Amino acid sequence: MGSSLILDNNFDNLNFSSLKIGIIQSEWNSKITDLLMISSRNYFLEVGIDNKNIITRKVPGSMELVYASNHMLINHDVDGIVTLGCIIKGETDHDKHIANAVSNGLVSVSIKHNKPISFGVLTTNNHNQALSRAGGNKGDKGKESAYTLLKMLDLVWV
């Protein structure tokens, strides 16, 4: 089953010319996260966000997304952040521990700074599942994460 998220691009309250967006990409599983980054960034450009207002950073792995998000919110005055990563199950439960720590950490950072952080971290059983969610037949989670951030910003800018 593909994604059921409908990208309506209906953002009544956003002034795209003044938005400043952060995108933080994990380099682990970069063949996947590169695709997520391209589609996320392209979506922001398509809706009219100026390229100079999109700040991108790369971190070694998904765990580092938490620290980097906190740092970006403190030092770059962004309105919100898209985090992109790919955690693929291995032989142990390590993936679950990483995914839980990252999701909980990003929620904490978002609440601490009162700014939205969109969770574009894939958690899959294998590489093919990840590819199918990075623009394949199961959706484009990079684009969907960018859309989700804009929907949240539209909500809070009322």
Report residues per predicted region.
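Glycine-rich phosphate/diphosphate-binding loop of Rossmann-like nucleotide-binding domains
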Residues: 11-56
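Structural motif
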Residues: 22, 64, 79-81, 115-121
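Short, ordered loop/turn segments at secondary-structure junctions
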Residues: 27-28, 86-87, 122-126
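C-terminal binding/interaction regions
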Residues: 95-96, 100-158
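Glycine-rich phosphate-binding loop
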Residues: 64-106
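N-terminal presequence-like segments and the immediate start of the first folded domain
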Residues: 1-20, 136-139, 151-155
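Short glycine/serine/threonine-rich phosphate/pyrophosphate-binding segments
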Residues: 4, 33, 65-66
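Short, charge-patterned binding micro-sites
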Residues: 60-61
